[in-house]
């Protein structure tokens, strides 16, 4: 029998991991949340070492995501994809910046090729990245897939600003912890 629906969830602990009423005004606070989510996901054994959060123009939290690929047996359950989905469901729009102005995505690590593409379609205007793709591959053993040689330039052409290396050392530590455990799928 073919399945007629897909049901993806965040782990129960995720609601205790952040203050939904907090003001995440600066980029460091946004990135800190993404890295915290990635670390908690590893600590709880609820998925891979990745966290992401979507923020409104005012710095308010719209949605979060953590990697849930293994628990849900689906390759699309990356942290960024989960953050997009929870945010899109919350605001009931597939293009997050359609009516709200500039939207920011903070990620614990550079998006893989799938999440990179989804960032364009989800309506992201700013992308805050912690660890680099080479960190993900060397420390945790993941294959991030093919990205355009000038991936930053491609995003810039679409009006998406990229800021890298925010809390990179903290994000790298989470990846290294996960990599040492040998849990790469």
Regions from the PLM with identified roles:
Residues 179-185:
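Active-site/ligand-binding-proximal alpha/beta "capping" segment
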Residues 50-59:
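Short beta-strand scaffold segments in enzyme catalytic cores
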Residues 64-173:
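Zn2+-dependent cytidine deaminase-like catalytic core
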